[in-house]
Design a protein with these regions (language model features):
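Bacterial N-terminal signal peptides that target proteins for export
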Residues: 1-10
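Ligand-binding clefts/hinges and TM-proximal coupling segments of bilobed small-molecule sensing domains
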Residues: 26-28, 153-170, 207-208, 237-263
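Extracytoplasmic small-molecule ligand-binding "clamshell" domains
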Residues: 26-103, 169, 251
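Short loop->beta-strand "edge-of-pocket" segments that line small-molecule binding or catalytic clefts
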Residues: 37-44, 59, 137-152, 166
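Beta->alpha turn/N-cap motifs
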Residues: 41-46, 81-85, 95-107, 129, ...
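Periplasmic-binding protein-like
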Residues: 44, 119-130, 192, 196-237, ...
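Acidic, polar ligand-binding/catalytic clefts
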Residues: 67, 71, 76-140, 204-212
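Hydrophobic residues within well-ordered alpha-helices
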Residues: 69, 92-93, 139, 179-181, ...
Length: 263
């Protein structure tokens, strides 16, 4: 289900003196935002996409990188909200959304095209207060229920890792927190920035030591727009080198990330 999140209050305009440079900028905008508006897919509850700070202001990797890119292109931005990232990937594949930031998996690369990595993020497990599960080795036991986001990397990967524990899909992060309260799951598996965000809402909850893998976050665009990838790769490199990416992480409270390797 998609919900229009409204257009940003600004329309960023780039003023370029040379006609050739202006035409080049227009060409870049048409590559990434052929409708004239950059449609950015976001989902609430994860700093890698969008969260809201104490003042009610939205932040997040997809949210803020999308805003910075729209400003660079000189086009308005439309944030389109979904319940989970799998729905955004489908919308990008179908041409309903222009981009998002998500884990660049081989499976998703069959549906969308990716920029160079933006960040690397550890994957982990969250357990509630007073959980008998104290380490990863305690998980694969009869009766243990592992929550994952429906359509996520965790849902596809963990069934091959755990032979005894049960995988329980949740519609969203918000739903998963409620599932903890009802005893429907014993732990939750996803990227650590999301787990930290969840733990802030669950007194006494903790993230287990170690990790079970890593996500490589990148900008995803529809297939057929590969001509835009050099522009996106330059944009990513500039956001990394200028410190802008560090600021985005701090504003979103994004924890559990490391620098991305570049091919």
């Amino acid at each position: 289900m998609r919900i229009s999140f409204g257009r940003a209050a600004y329309t960023a305009l780039l003023f370029v003196c040379l006609p050739g440079a202006s035409a080049h900028a227009d060409g870049e905008a048409k590559l990434l935002a052929p409708s004239g508006t950059l449609r950015v897919g976001i989902y609430p509850g994860s700093p890698t996409s969008m969260v809201t700070d104490a003042a009610g202001k939205p932040h997040g990797l997809a949210y803020d990188l999308g805003g910075a890119l729209a400003k660079r292109l000189g086009v308005p931005i439309d944030y389109v909200r979904f319940q989970r990232v799998a729905d955004i990937v489908t919308a990008i594949h179908d041409g309903q959304v222009d981009l998002t930031v998500t884990n660049a998996t081989p499976a998703r690369a069959n549906e969308v095209s990716f920029s160079e990595p933006v960040l690397a993020i550890e994957l982990g497990y969250l357990v509630p207060a007073n959980s008998p599960i104290g380490k990863a080795e305690d998980i694969d036991k009869p009766g243990v229920k592992i929550g994952v986001t429906k359509g996520s990397t965790s849902e596809r990967t963990l069934p091959t890792k755990f032979k005894t524990a049960t995988i329980v899909p949740a519609e969203s992060v918000k739903v998963a927190i409620a599932m903890f309260g009802r005893g429907e799951i014993d732990l939750y598996a996803t990227n650590k920035p999301t787990l930290f965000e969840m733990s802030d809402q669950m007194p006494g909850a903790k993230i287990l030591d170690g990790n079970w893998g890593a996500e490589h976050m990148a900008i995803a665009v529809p297939k057929g727009r590969e001509a835009a990838l050099p522009l996106l790769n330059r944009f990513v490199a500039e956001e990394q080198s200028s410190g802008a990416l560090d600021t985005i992480q701090q504003q979103a409270g994004l924890r559990g990330a490391t620098k991305a390797g570049r091919e």
